[in-house]
């Protein structure tokens, strides 16, 4: 895989690339940081620390239809840090404890018209979301989910959240990013072990167990993606794999 050395990847505004030469704004943008982006039912969804999008009140989450921004119901009561689409619904995770006026625990889903609490909850902040093997996966600052120990990462199964191989460890085990590479789920963050195996800030899950990616990365990883068939990681680190 390929490593890109970078600072933490936090977006502080919204722009679109109109062509290969120029950037342009999406209306008036937001009044505070944007932490997460995804596409849901043909619209761009943004989540973050903002309470205004394009001059319209929007509590921490908003949608862009190509012309203007609008809120998703009453939004959430605190910042949104992660977004994904699962089973036809938009899933949001973050620091919030209510969504659309409904009490939730750091995660909720939007069905196109309203928020619900059908995903149960986790014990603390959700920093990353993805779908792996047709199951929702959440990572973050939580040691427990549905009152069970999961150690910073869990998958949603019928009836609740489930641990993934014992989760992550180290002096700080938080998972900050989730991605895919080949048939594996990739997790990255503060942790220095995964499933009891040494794994410096990045590890892969094959559906049954965790393993390291080489000697790992020297410090915190905040972002993962793929480009040209390679895994790209960004964060606060200055070396990776001994390089």
Residue locations for each model-derived region?
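Extracytoplasmic surface signature
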Residues: 1-243
């Amino acid at each position: 895989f390929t490593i890109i050395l970078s600072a933490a990847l936090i977006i502080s505004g919204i722009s679109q690339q109109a062509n290969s030469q120029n950037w342009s704004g999406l209306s008036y943008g937001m009044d505070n940081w944007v932490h997460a982006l995804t596409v849901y039912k043909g619209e761009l969804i943004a989540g973050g620390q903002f309470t205004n999008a394009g001059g319209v009140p929007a509590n921490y989450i908003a949608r862009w239809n190509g012309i203007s921004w609008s809120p998703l119901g009453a939004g959430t009561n605190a910042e949104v840090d992660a977004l994904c689409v699962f089973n036809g619904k938009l899933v949001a995770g973050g620091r919030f404890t209510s969504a659309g006026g409904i009490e939730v625990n750091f995660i909720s889903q939007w069905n196109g018209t309203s928020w619900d609490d059908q995903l149960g909850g986790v014990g603390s902040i959700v920093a990353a979301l993805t779908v792996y093997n047709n199951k929702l996966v959440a990572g973050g600052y939580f040691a427990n989910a549905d009152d069970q120990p999961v150690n910073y990462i869990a998958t949603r199964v019928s009836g609740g959240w489930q641990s993934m191989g014992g989760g992550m460890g180290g002096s700080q085990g938080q998972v900050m990013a989730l991605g895919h590479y080949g048939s594996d789920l990739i997790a990255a963050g503060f942790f220095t072990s995964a499933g009891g195996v040494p794994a410096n800030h990045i590890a892969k899950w094959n559906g049954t167990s965790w393993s390291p990616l080489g000697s790992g990365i020297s410090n915190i990883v905040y972002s993962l993606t793929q480009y040209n068939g390679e895994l790209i990681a960004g964060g606060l680190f200055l070396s990776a794999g001994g390089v």
